[in-house]
């Protein structure tokens, strides 16, 4: 049985992880463009979710959301590639730690299996939107 957290705690966890990543990259000093790259990744994910097609069947809904999620992670890794080696490693570590939180309805759970349950789509979307809001609030505070 996994840990069950509400949206507020999930947002806090994601915000802390992103703040930790930003601080690690900021400390490196040679990654001036990484902040722009990372914010572009967040904005692209937000735009994708905002322009989410309506009226799709459940299987297509899950596939579409998971594609956005994987694109976000690929974009982030690409943005961090030009930084010192520690930033990309830190992102990969945060991604693995987030996956291990085992939060019911998370995108890691939804997109981690090829047969994700359609019923968990709405909680996952709300978790994503709350998490993005927290991430953007944290991002703008720096």
Swiss-Prot record:
Q: Tissue-wise, where is it found?
A: Expressed in the brain (at protein level).
Q: Where in the cell is it found?
A: Cell membrane; Synapse
The UniProt keywords, alphabetically, are:
Cell membrane, Glycoprotein, GPI-anchor, Lipoprotein, Membrane, Signal, Synapse
What upregulates it? By synaptic activity through NMDA receptors and L-type voltage-sensitive calcium channels. By cAMP in active neurons.
Give the lipid-moiety residues, type GPI-anchor amidated glycine.
Answer: 116
- Describe its assembly: Component of the outer core of AMPAR complex. AMPAR complex consists of an inner core made of 4 pore-forming GluA/GRIA proteins (GRIA1, GRIA2, GRIA3 and GRIA4) and 4 major auxiliary subunits arranged in a twofold symmetry. One of the two pairs of distinct binding sites is occupied either by CNIH2, CNIH3 or CACNG2, CACNG3. The other harbors CACNG2, CACNG3, CACNG4, CACNG8 or GSG1L. This inner core of AMPAR complex is complemented by outer core constituents binding directly to the GluA/GRIA proteins at sites distinct from the interaction sites of the inner core constituents.
Q: What is this protein called?
A: Neuritin
Organism of derivation: Mus musculus (Mouse)
